[in-house]
Amino acid sequence: MDDSIMDIKEIMKLCKLNEEEMAKYLDLSKNLDHKTDHSRAYRTMMNQTRRELLKYIGTDIRTDRQIEIEFQTDIEQLRYHLSMLEQLFYIMNTESGWKATPRGIGFLENAIMGE
């Protein structure tokens, strides 16, 4: 096994979802059609802004305002990109702010960080 690839236990330690949020994430993402999902994920993550958003959220909790200040972009455009990441279960909008899911952290750590 490649030691540079982060395993699920490491990913779960980094995830900021609380127990209730994790249960919701697991429920929503349990019936993914992996073939269709892979294609959607590929197309979605080809967008530089979305990759940068996922990096910025990372293992932190980010508010809409923090994201808006960091990206200096129209809030409606940011909401569109955040929505795309949320539909793929890479991030969740929680009461405390945007959080990366285990899937998002896995993608971030195993695919994006090498950029």
Q: Could you say what each language-model-derived stretch is?
A:
Residues 64-65, 83, 96:
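Residues within the helices of the helix-turn-helix
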Residues 86-96:
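A short, conserved structural fragment
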Residues 66-70:
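A short acidic, leucine-rich amphipathic alpha-helix
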Residues 23-52:
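Short alpha-helical segments that sit at the start of domains
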Residues 71-87:
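Short amphipathic alpha-helical interaction segments
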Residues 105-115:
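Short, amphipathic alpha-helical interaction segments positioned at domain boundaries
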